Design a protein with these regions (language model features):
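Low-complexity repeat regions of mature extracellularly deployed or surface/particle-associated proteins
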Residues: 23-199
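Bacterial N-terminal signal peptides that target proteins for export
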Residues: 1-10
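C-terminal segment of classical bacterial N-terminal signal peptides
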Residues: 14-23
Length: 199
């Protein structure tokens, strides 16, 4: 997998993972549910290459808290000529206690590279928030699409979404935007960086 996919985001994932929760669900009188994403990976023509790395880490729930972590819908495709399509998705669940509810969705993620000399990279990291005292924290990692279709195309996208904190019947909703990144025609190039942080 190309190193560019992991720059910055791998560091974020490791730091967040150690800070928030270990790789397994932590439950002490709570419920933690984790879905690892739908993941699809395709590479077809010529010098095509489609890489995909998806990591989903469960959150922690205690004292009747509930944590639901969904690792995104992830799709990755590279079809023609000198195509390359990367994709790196990391979703880390949040922390719920005292009847708090935390929902973390890793975005809808799609990554495509189609035609001649195309290249599309995508990196998405979604970190769930925390909730306690009947609070609810909802974090959505954006709708994310990344495309490079024709000629000398190249498209780059990086999205980070950090959830917030909800306490005492509070509600905290963080959505990482509707993100779309495209480079379509002759000599095209497109780059996008999105950061969304809750409190």
């Amino acid at each position: 997998m190309r190193a560019t996919l992991f720059a910055g985001f791998a560091v974020l994932a490791v730091v967040a993972a150690t800070a928030v929760t270990p790789a397994s669900a932590q439950t002490t009188g709570g419920i933690s549910i984790t879905h690892g994403g739908n993941n699809l990976n395709t590479a077809k023509g010529k010098f095509s290459e489609a890489d995909q790395a998806v990591t989903t880490l469960a959150g922690s729930a205690s004292r009747h808290g509930k944590v639901v972590t969904n690792g995104g819908r992830n799709t990755n495709t590279a079809l023609g000529k000198f195509s390359f399509a990367g994709q790196d998705v990391t979703t880390i669940g949040g922390d719920a206690s005292g009847r708090g509810r935390v929902f973390t969705n890793g975005g809808l993620n799609t990554n495509t590279a189609r035609g001649f000399a195309s290249s599309a990279t995508q990196s998405i990291a979604t970190l769930g928030g925390s909730a306690f005292g009947n609070g609810r924290s909802i974090t959505n990692g954006g709708h994310n699409t990344n495309l490079a279709a024709g000629r000398f195309s190249s498209a780059d996208q990086q999205v980070v979404t950090l959830g917030g904190t909800a306490g005492r019947h509070g509600l905290n909703v963080v959505s990482g935007g509707n993100n779309r990144n495209a480079a379509l025609g002759f000599g095209s190039s497109a780059s996008q960086q999105v950061f969304t942080g809750g409190q």
